Regions:
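N-terminal structural segment of carbohydrate-active enzymes
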Residues: 1-198, 213
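Short, solvent-exposed loop/turn segments at the edges of secondary structure
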Residues: 76, 167-170, 252-254, 283, ...
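Aromatic- and acidic-residue-enriched segments that line the glycan-binding/catalytic groove
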Residues: 92-108, 164-176, 205-248, 334-347
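Aromatic/hydrophobic pocket-lining residues that form the small-molecule binding cavity
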Residues: 138, 181, 185, 266-273, ...
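A generic secondary-structure signal
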Residues: 141-144, 191, 275-279, 307-311
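Active-site-proximal helices and loops of the catalytic beta/alpha 8
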Residues: 189-198, 206-207, 212-223, 286, ...
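Active-site-adjacent "subsite" loops/lids of carbohydrate-active enzymes
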Residues: 213-283, 293-294
Length: 349
């Protein structure tokens, strides 16, 4: 036979209230079986099944989510489709690629062309070979995507950048002209709305490219970048140990200088009422996917969530925020702190 036991937890009493007046948190617990001769503890490896043993083992985990701001209902009601813009489809609209010594190299063979690869791991690679996919092409394919049941379209980064992948952002306030620029994004959003398809953008807010308006290592932009002068308005957006060539970068990759979100001006540029996050929500996107979200601070995520949700109050669809978090986002510890991505007020997924 089997013994069946039921356990009721009063989560309100368990959680208490945090500083914001919410009941949420991550809790660890074990069940004890007390017998005449000994006490056994549960040991759960997967948070579902368990074995009994004399020592503590691994605890069950209980994530209590603040229900005051739930995940948008529309998210998850259809297929989510990811598009890597340069390799999806060439559209008929106008485009303009960067030229010059650091400009784009076009690959004419869409079906069989092979982009350059580094000979050895760690070798530098330009990543400036383009196959010609653009936002016009994405818009032209919406009828096909709708027939597949797609209701959410998640795009790879579209902001102006040197590379084909655009994870080295050059200007957060400009859609890359090689992808069709502002006109192509507006056309895509307008058509997607008619098809009932939500569009999510990829936000790379942990770092920029070194070839950016803000760092401007190569003098591509008219602004004085942090690399060019210690008097640059963007100097404190980055962390230099020895200006100009020693600075914090994403995983030590020098072409991706890391942004200093401890600087209020830098952080507000993304998270403020008129910041990047809110600006594009008001323009018509349905949400953001945050690149390397586990490297963004709690302050950044809290403020970004608040500004994006507030901007969404003006639109018909509540915006969603998705984060790239390696390992288990419900219980992850990053940079010495237990993170609260999924407890409410930061990430929806």
């Amino acid at each position: 036979g089997q013994d069946i036991c039921e356990l009721e937890l009063d989560t309100a009493a368990l959680c208490g209230l945090d500083a914001g007046g919410r009941r949420s948190g991550l809790f660890f617990y074990r069940l004890l079986l007390v017998r005449d001769q000994d006490t056994l503890f549960t040991d759960s490896r997967n948070n579902v099944d368990f074995t009994l043993g004399a020592d503590g083992g691994q605890a069950f985990r209980l994530l209590v989510y603040d229900g005051g701001d739930p995940v948008p209902e529309w998210f998850g009601q259809g297929v989510l489709y990811h598009v890597f813009v340069d390799r999806f489809r060439r559209g008929a609209g106008a485009v303009r690629y960067q030229t010059g010594a650091r400009g784009a190299v076009m690959e004419p063979d869409w079906a069989h062309g092979i982009p350059p690869f580094a000979e050895r791991q760690g070798d530098s690679l330009a990543n400036n070979t383009f196959f010609g996919g653009n936002l016009w092409g994405v818009a032209e394919a919406l009828d096909y995507l709708a027939d597949l049941g797609v209701r959410v379209l998640y795009l790879s980064p579209i902001f102006r950048a040197y590379s084909n992948h655009k994870y080295d952002t050059g200007d957060y306030l400009a859609v890359d002209e090689g992808f069709g620029g502002e006109a192509a994004l507006d056309a895509l959003l307008d058509k997607a709305k008619r098809y009932g398809i939500a569009v999510i953008l990829d936000g790379v807010f942990n770092h920029t490219g070194d070839d950016s308006r803000y760092f401007n290592r190569y003098g591509t932009y008219p602004d004085t970048g942090a690399y060019q002068s210690p008097d640059s308005p963007y100097r404190d957006w980055y962390e230099f140990s020895e200006w100009p060539d020693r600075y914090a970068s994403w995983w030590g990759i020098p072409i991706l200088p890391k942004l200093n979100h401890k600087n209020d001006v830098c952080r507000s540029f993304f998270t403020g009422v008129d910041g990047v996050g809110a600006r594009y929500i008001r323009r018509g996107i349905a949400g953001w996917r945050l690149d390397v979200a586990d490297e963004l601070s709690d302050d950044f995520l809290d403020e970004f969530h608040a500004s994006v949700r507030a901007a969404g109050e003006e639109s018909a669809r509540k915006p969603v925020i998705i984060g790239e978090v390696w390992e288990n986002a419900a219980e992850k510890t990053a940079y010495g702190r237990r993170r609260r991505y999924l407890q409410g007020g930061q990430l929806d997924s």
